[in-house]
Amino acid sequence: MEDGHSKTVDEVLSHFRVDPERGLSLDQVKEYQKKYGPNELPAEEGKTLWQLVLEQFDDLLVKILLLAAIISFVLALFEEHEGVEAFVEPFVILLILIANAVVGVWQERNAESAIEALKEYEPEMGKVIRGDKSGVQKIRAKEIVPGDVVEVSVGDKIPADIRLIKIYSTTIRIDQSILTGESVSVIKHTDAVPDPRAVNQDKKNILFSGTNVAAGKARGVVIGTGLNTAIGKIRTEMSETEEIKTPLQQKLDEFGEQLSKVISLICVAVWAINIGHFNDPAHGGSWIKGAVYYFKIAVALAVAAIPEGLPAVITTCLALGTRRMAKKNAIVRSLPSVETLGCTSVICSDKTGTLTTNQMSVSRMFIFEKIEGNDSSFTEFEISGSTYEPIGEVTLNGQRIKAADYETLHELGTICIMCNDSAIDFNETKKVFEKVGEATETALIVLAEKLNPFNVAKQGLDRRSSAICVRQEIETKWKKEFTLEFSRDRKSMSSYCTPLKASKLGNGPKLFCKGAPEGVLERCTHARVGSTKVPLTQTLKQRILDLTRTYGTGRDTLRCLALATADSPMKPDDMDLNDSTKFYTYEVNLTFVGVVGMLDPPRKEVQDSIVRCRAAGIRVIVITGDNKATAEAICRRIGVFGEDEDTTGKSYSGREFDDLSVSEQREACSRARLFSRVEPAHKSKIVEFLQSMNEISAMTGDGVNDAPALKKAEIGIAMGSGTAVAKSAAEMVLADDNFSSIVAAVEEGRAIYNNMKQFIRYLISSNIGEVVSIFLTAALGLPEALIPVQLLWVNLVTDGLPATALGFNPPDLDIMTKPPRKADEGLISGWLFFRYMAIGGYVGCATVGGAAWWFMFSETGPQLSYWQLTHHLSCLGGGEEFKGIDCKIFNDPHPMTMALSVLVTIEMLNAMNSLSENQSLVQMPPWCNIWLIASMCLSFALHFVILYVDVLSTVFQVTPLDGNEWMTVMKFSLPVVLLDEILKFVARRISDGESYIKNMHGLVLAWAVFFAYIIWGP
């Protein structure tokens, strides 16, 4: 039933043709079951394991690697002279692909749990009244249908969306925090809410499915079941939300596509260039064998071009980032989101508990100082402290005072304790104080403990004992006999108390009362001034209300309660405690004591975090279910708005936002800083508008209602104290629910992205070097310098360790003073690509040069001519050109070892270069990152292991090198440092706006030094 909240009880009953005393007949139940279906949320239709596994292989780079593995395996099967070593390459490639697939499947499985977590809010049983049986009967909740008359009482979980028709207790309170985020339980009533557009918070006559009864007993008619409930609509919205890839994932996908196209072109080119060599004598004159040989080289090229270690290094770097974030109370559930935090441009933050402490606290109060006729003055106190721990100072005009010196405060403290059903409790695990009961009542308990009006000695007491000693003292003086519960009509509650011993308040019973100032003052005839009782005139009442209104508006927007006492209350025997409508007549002839103003105070560190966000170019939007005035007041206190800033066009209520056209809503989202009185649908809509403007949004939330928006936003941030559904839908969980932890996580995300750029640059330049080396050997007709299994070793192990260590680079000092990078900013800019090509080109040439040096110049080598080397495949055919040369020399492992050693050494030096994108090694030396030095040492150690351990040297087809050969390796390797220093020098000068000609002078000079080193070096 739509708009059930706006219909009267009779209209709802007639709509379902139901008698509130007898319930539905069995025929009606069957009819409605057929019409509306079962009262349950359908299970999520998840993907099968095989679907998830196959999805992991739906990537161009992965497909190319898989194809390379299959081809290598097939070629190894048909190879005549190869042993088990031939299968190492396809086996290692498959191992990499399987490992990546396992990680991918695990992450997807993790993400699917959000919708399933909703089912925990479905109750198993419900209490209904039906025509087949008299009285209340328990049935399975899934069998409940719209029109059923349901009864609920304290502790029950609401089985469906229910329209209240009758309340049996004084009041009925519902804890609907999971759905609306309201921290205080809500009092419900049976009256119609005439607004058809009312938000869930304003539907005071509806009990929502999955929420809990905090107090009272009532009966209602079911108006929505299954997917037609408020929680069901959230489930529908979540299932319709598509997963969006993070900016990094999108860039890596684009990079993969570009790389795969380049790989395909180069592989075809290498194969085509060598068509003329297919029938060389080395292939036995067989054109097919020659074609297969060069096909193997093309496969090796594909393996060389793909950075197999990149996924593992990225995962490791992100995992390290999550550990650092966890230390800052930000627990990351989805690894890719770590990097996304770095480009967050908008943070949409909940107010309650994130920007504020979610611990109501009395900050101001006033009592009468004097009354002379209609002339009067107030004493106004301020109270410090923003948590439930009763530590804080009571000040008057900035000076600390003793509450014991003010007799009125004796009575005020007593009312706070005795007219109260709540308490504070010390959580031994978390080492914090928590509320037991209502937030507003807990604030009064804490106030009384801070006041300590009876000067109770607290020295030597532990934290728990010192926090309850005032309460214990007051409870030795007074005994609570009964409570007149809060009701909507009088907006107050009171406690009938009798004295246990003589006190300044008198020897007779008292009725201590608290409530809305307007309602309490109506029933006040006197006011307390010190220990005297003075008549309260209408003029004085107006003055109290005026000051109360000042507390409730402006910068503070405090929630005010008036405290009063009935000095001579009616006798209990004359009261009818079962009829709440008569409570109003018992709370009469009250004496006004004072007014306390409380608020959910902002966290101390939030204001500084807002300033940091502004400096970092991040817009903070506060989204809350609170009313507009309260929300704006808090926003002014924390710096989202200036003290006197006009909020027109920057602050919208949910209703105001709905009244705008689509284009106006989009415009509002582009400049707004506050949305108040919002529903879950508003949050999702705001995220959609921000995404359409290419903003990267982080959205916070804690309730079930927040889950769709958390899932839709690029970064969903759930509160540690939030619901399981919110945590499952989010990418990150704040252990301390603190906004400042989000800012710390954003800073970490930016640092991680900078480090990722460095190791991606490092790995890609290495791969370009490998491609260049294979391309050169194939194009020039040189013997193989590197084979696939060696390339895999370099890509995965030798390069992987320093690349991972680059993730430990310290963040730049100015990282939070730069604007967020754009989501569509390329991973590789034009200048970076040129640097990759320059470094990669040198790596490839040096690698091939190392192998060629052994053939042409080494004392232990054959000392061939360049022509002989480039025509080595003709050696087996004989001829004068190869007279006296043993053709087996072309299978010697020395040249491959030289090439591999040059490649590894250059890559270690290149890792050193990657410490900073533009800073020289003189400014940022290697010991800035001790992990990098350790990883370089380990990589060299592993390289020596495969060279000097016989079993491994056979697998990798390498051999030990002598001192002269190692000296040559260093000669080929060291220039890469000089080359990168030149490129960094140019980058710095260009970014500083220096003259291009000056740059060219420096560049020419540096290149001259470089070539002099190559030609005349040792």
Swiss-Prot record:
It is a multi-pass membrane protein. PROSITE patterns: ATPASE_E1_E2 (PS00154). Keywords: ATP-binding, Calcium, Calcium transport, Endoplasmic reticulum, Ion transport, Magnesium, Membrane, Metal-binding, Nucleotide-binding, Phosphoprotein, Sarcoplasmic reticulum, Translocase, Transmembrane, Transmembrane helix, Transport. It comes from the Eukaryota. Residues 70-88, 273-294, 777-786, 851-896, 949-963 are lumenal. InterPro entries: ATPase_P-typ_cation-transptr_C, ATPase_P-typ_cation-transptr_N, ATPase_P-typ_cyto_dom_N, ATPase_P-typ_P_site, ATPase_P-typ_TM_dom_sf, ATPase_P-typ_transduc_dom_A_sf, HAD-like_sf, HAD_sf. Belongs to the cation transport ATPase (P-type) (TC 3.A.3) family. This is Calcium-transporting ATPase sarcoplasmic/endoplasmic reticulum type. The gene is SERCA.
